[in-house]
Curated annotation (Swiss-Prot):
Self-association state and partner proteins as the record states: Core component of the polycomb repressive deubiquitinase (PR-DUB) complex, at least composed of BAP1, one of ASXL1, ASXL2 or (probably) ASXL3, and one of MBD5 or MBD6. Distinct combinations of ASXL and MBD proteins may preferentially bind specific histone modification marks. The PR-DUB core associates with a number of accessory proteins, including FOXK1, FOXK2, KDM1B, HCFC1 and OGT; KDM1B specifically associates with ASXL2 PR-DUB complexes.
Pro residues: bias regions: 140-155, 268-287, 391-407, 439-456, 570-589, 603-617, 805-817
Organism of this sequence: Homo sapiens (Human)
Low complexity: compositionally biased ranges: 297-308, 319-328, 348-361, 408-426, 460-498, 531-548, 590-602, 618-633, 650-662, 732-761, 768-778, 788-798, 818-837
Bias (Polar residues) ranges: 707-718, 959-969
Disulphide-bonded residues: none
Protein name: Methyl-CpG-binding domain protein 6
Biased composition (Gly residues): 635-649
Amino acid sequence: MNGGNESSGADRAGGPVATSVPIGWQRCVREGAVLYISPSGTELSSLEQTRSYLLSDGTCKCGLECPLNVPKVFNFDPLAPVTPGGAGVGPASEEDMTKLCNHRRKAVAMATLYRSMETTCSHSSPGEGASPQMFHTVSPGPPSARPPCRVPPTTPLNGGPGSLPPEPPSVSQAFPTLAGPGGLFPPRLADPVPSGGSSSPRFLPRGNAPSPAPPPPPAISLNAPSYNWGAALRSSLVPSDLGSPPAPHASSSPPSDPPLFHCSDALTPPPLPPSNNLPAHPGPASQPPVSSATMHLPLVLGPLGGAPTVEGPGAPPFLASSLLSAAAKAQHPPLPPPSTLQGRRPRAQAPSASHSSSLRPSQRRPRRPPTVFRLLEGRGPQTPRRSRPRAPAPVPQPFSLPEPSQPILPSVLSLLGLPTPGPSHSDGSFNLLGSDAHLPPPPTLSSGSPPQPRHPIQPSLPGTTSGSLSSVPGAPAPPAASKAPVVPSPVLQSPSEGLGMGAGPACPLPPLAGGEAFPFPSPEQGLALSGAGFPGMLGALPLPLSLGQPPPSPLLNHSLFGVLTGGGGQPPPEPLLPPPGGPGPPLAPGEPEGPSLLVASLLPPPPSDLLPPPSAPPSNLLASFLPLLALGPTAGDGEGSAEGAGGPSGEPFSGLGDLSPLLFPPLSAPPTLIALNSALLAATLDPPSGTPPQPCVLSAPQPGPPTSSVTTATTDPGASSLGKAPSNSGRPPQLLSPLLGASLLGDLSSLTSSPGALPSLLQPPGPLLSGQLGLQLLPGGGAPPPLSEASSPLACLLQSLQIPPEQPEAPCLPPESPASALEPEPARPPLSALAPPHGSPDPPVPELLTGRGSGKRGRRGGGGLRGINGEARPARGRKPGSRREPGRLALKWGTRGGFNGQMERSPRRTHHWQHNGELAEGGAEPKDPPPPGPHSEDLKVPPGVVRKSRRGRRRKYNPTRNSNSSRQDITLEPSPTARAAVPLPPRARPGRPAKNKRRKLAP
């Protein structure tokens, strides 16, 4: 740079030469001595010292010209004039960053960042607390990357958050900063309530309305949708704006611009935000509450959203949901986009924002989910939409991935919104829908619906996603919906409480009322459902928001739920899980595709308070939601669900039957659980997709109990076979459908935390818990009893999940005997067979396995002896099959006996062991009981030819086991022969024995 150039005068030998100071360096005269201070702070007082410094390793030499002439650049003559050119200060020096060292670059970057933040904040939050919003707003913005320049500034603002995208947490920080105003960050929750509107992050509109509009898009745009949203938001938000200004605060403002606002505002203007949030809805008022929830979500989400990734926002909020959603998304990734954004976008977007805001908090909490979110992100489109609102949330970055989730968030928000602002519900739920709408997948609900025929109503809604949401309640009048939200606004007041739950319900009901709408909004309905039906959930969401506690999770749940619901048609439905917060009732939107998503609403707890108030409305919501769900899954099915919805809270929705099974058990164990779940779900969803999954249950749980909220739809083939499931629906949705993942189940067990919660199945809380869950899953739908069964839901779940749809029918039959937990399993035998792996996963299986063959035997079984493993190996001949079936069945059925070969043996059922050995060996029951003994016996018992073949194998193993190693060895040799002769198994078997033998020896 200037360094050497300016010293051109140096060559005048003699007399002081004008010197310029290299960029990044400082020259000062102390006590007649000249000191050069390097960019790293080292002080150099002489040319010698300078040369030594420049030649040393690890010293900063930035800012010096390339061919460096030390005497020219460093002039230690105190009298030498200094030309300004070289100073490292000023625009010129900042322009040439190539010559700036990291030290300098960082300093310049920080200065620039602050500068930009100031500008963005100031203009960004025209009226809102510029400062607060400034900071993070930007952060979200940046993530959004969108135009919102403000965003960028924001980023800087965030500084930490600035990383914004990078550091969602920062974002949160920012928020807090923001929050300064409200502390909000946390406030995000608190704020959220007020923020309700926030959620509207629509905040955009809020103060910025116009201005923000653009930014909002960014925020919104954070999500992919942002683009549309920008406009949509703008339009919808802006209007919303009216209340919005405060909304800005909606953390949800998250949209970058708004985010700023909402950030700053977020904290403050929560109330207005709502309107923003729901820009679509007049309900800013109501929105606010929702907002608050939203708000916080957005914070969480926002951050996520902030990340361009849509997902981000949502993701964190719903770990589980995101996971689920991811799974769902995996199945239907496409969905999101479509809906997304189209008409609904604008409106939805607002809702989405709100949702996102609510989500955001949660989101923040669950940063880990990002991964899932990423998955979601794939679905992203919709997510993004949701996220968008959240974008502002600095969090976004962390959850960029989550953004996809975001849609969910939006859904959640919707849910929240639903709950939050009753209308919100409509709004919110619609919001959710809207969010969904934003998110393509969620659109399922709202957005999706537009895209999808599913929501007949949608049509009117379609245009407005948000509208659609609201529309759901009154499809045609999204605005109305928004208005509705207003109504809830009072509810909003209760924001913290169900935040909108109560309000939501009202809204939601309308949605119900709009039965038509349901179809289209099925997802939405699900949201509504969750809102209404699961006031707890919704309430929980809001609560957390207001509380600023984990509840955000609930938002997540909601959003998940929304997503799921939305997913109904769309793959990306995301389960909601209110993890913490509250009881959020789980919603069981059905995923249209087989994919069952089980969403655990983890909300149970917090929401309880909320629940009550919201509870009534919530139930409506739930009811409406369910119908929606029902609709969602099948395009047309919704109607039945509407019917189901009819039974607001408690009734299961027959209609849900069509829905794909989604079960959202309220899970305490949240995200991780869900995450696991989601994986399972993802795996499962596809297979089931063939099946129409029916929502097994979806009972709309009682509004009151968050737990009851759980409804499940079975996606499992079994579930579908369970056509009964629907009837089950009458029952509490016991079927949790395979939807639940084993992990889910496992989580459920953790869930056990509160059976009540679990009770997501309307039914009673207790049994439902893991056992129930598991059972239900197992049965697929057929077995309502699952409730009773608490056995390893996990195993059951796994089984059901893994079971291919093909087997569903068989399972169906068994469902008849779903009464016993195990028995329901038998119903699933085919499933079992299909899912031997499941069997193994099932805890029971392990037991069985272990029981069967204590050490080696079990191993052997695993190796191939076992039914499960054996199955894998055809070499065993039919045995593998029989054994496998039995083994599996045995595992699942326990005493029942093997489905295949074992049916006969069912009496023996002694052990799965037995089944293993016994399948082949009719007799050797005793063997089964004692692993070692059985082995010996097996070896000893040469009678059964089939058995022999096995025997040979066993022998191989047994040799080490049995004391008669020599005899066994001998036997082994003959065994091959005998085997070859007697056993149908190919002579290859003889070889196998060798293999086995080797194996035995090796261990």
